[in-house]
C-alpha cells in the first residue's frame, strides 16, 4: 500500500546561511549605520536572537530575516516570534524560535482533518511525524493537498513517499 510521512523540519544549515546573509545586508543598510544591531543563531536550542536599539528596528530586522529565510526555501511560519520584545538597558531584542517537529495537539488536528475529509486513507501518529497510508496514489495526493491547503500555522513537508 502506498504511504508517506508528514513532518515539520527546518534545515539548520539553510537557516545559518539565511542569518549570515541577513547580517551581511545589515552591514550595508544605510538606516542601520552606527546602530548596534545583530542576528545571533543558537544551534543548540534552535533560536535566533534579533537585537537592536529600538523596537521599530527589531521589526525591520525581523522583516529582513524573514525575507532571507524565504529566499533559502524556509517558510516564515516556521519562525515563532513572541509578540512582546524584551527591553534591556538601551537595547531591545526578541528570541525567535524555529519550529521543529509536530506537537501532539497539531498531530491530532491533522489526523482529524484527514479523517473528516472522507478520503480513503488512514493516518497514524508515529513520534513527531504522521504516517498516511491509502490504496491509491491519488488519495494520498489528495491528503497532501488537504494538509497544504489547511491553514494550520506551520509548514509541513512530505517524506518517504512509497508506492
From Swiss-Prot:
Nucleotide-binding protein. GO terms for cellular component: cytosol. It comes from Enterobacter sp. (strain 638). One of its GO terms (molecular function) is nucleotide binding. HAMAP family: YajQ. NCBIfam families: PRK05412.1. Keywords: Nucleotide-binding. Belongs to the YajQ family. This is Nucleotide-binding protein Ent638_0893. Gene3D superfamilies: 3.30.70.860, YajQ-like, domain 2 (3.30.70.990).
Amino acid at each position: 500500500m502506498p504511504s508517506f510521512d508528514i513532518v515539520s523540519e527546518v534545515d539548520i544549515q539553510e537557516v545559518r546561511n539565511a542569518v549570515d546573509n541577513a547580517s551581511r545586508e545589515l552591514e550595508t543598510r544605510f538606516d542601520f549605520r552606527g546602530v548596534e544591531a545583530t542576528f545571533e543563531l543558537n544551534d543548540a536550542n534552535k533560536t535566533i536572537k534579533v537585537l537592536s536599539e529600538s523596537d521599530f528596528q527589531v521589526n525591520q530586522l525581523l522583516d529582513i530575516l524573514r525575507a532571507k529565510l524565504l529566499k533559502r526555501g524556509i517558510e516564515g511560519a516556521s519562525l515563532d516570534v513572541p509578540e512582546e520584545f524584551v527591553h534591556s538597558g538601551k537595547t531591545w531584542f526578541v528570541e525567535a524560535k524555529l519550529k521543529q517537529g509536530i506537537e501532539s495537539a497539531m498531530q491530532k488536528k491533522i489526523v482529524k482533518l484527514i479523517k473528516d475529509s472522507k478520503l480513503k486513507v488512514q493516518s497514524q501518529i508515529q513520534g513527531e511525524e504522521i504516517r498516511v497510508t491509502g490504496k491509491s496514489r491519488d488519495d494520498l495526493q489528495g491528503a497532501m493537498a488537504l494538509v497544504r491547503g489547511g491553514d494550520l500555522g506551520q509548514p509541513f513537508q512530505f517524506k518517504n513517499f512509497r508506492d
